[in-house]
Amino acid sequence: MILAGGTARRMGGISKADVPIKGKRLLDYLLDDLAAQQITSVTVVAPPSVQLPPGVQRSLEDPPLGGPVAGIAAGLACLHPAKELTLLLSCDAPLAARCLPALANALIHDGAVAYHEGYRQLLVGLYRTEKLRGAVAPGGQGLRDISVKRALAGLDLTTCPITWLATDLDTLGDVENFAAQL
């Protein structure tokens, strides 16, 4: 699941999913890396204005702009009930799909998340689907306007040291610096 909605205030309101780096949208970096790992079931939580390739499922919280936790709940509602694991990514971390092998190796309890620059990157994680669902939609009702950190606080998460692959791009300056490293 890729979160690709939001207002992107620190990007000047530009859709993060559509920000180009070297001729490719941030979202497309993730989709291409998932395809390279034979991940074929992908849900993107994004408004209709974000173009998705054929075969990629779209979801969006209702009403929109309820925050990332509401987006996660909306994305989970689209998943097949038998899905044991959910890879959760944010479109502003364009290389994060490359963390999947390390996250899978680190998964012990409820999930494994990237640890980068002194922080747990909760939107770069591999989660046990039912545990994630219980955290973001207790009682089947998706939470809104709550931080991801607070919603996932009760989960037993393993941290996985990850290099710059988990870098998230919050400003146009971040995008420029990241592009220079590619």
Regions found by a protein language model. Name each.
Residues 1-145, 153-165, 172-175:
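Nucleotide and nucleotide-moiety/phosphate-recognizing core
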Residues 176-182:
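SAM-dependent methyltransferases
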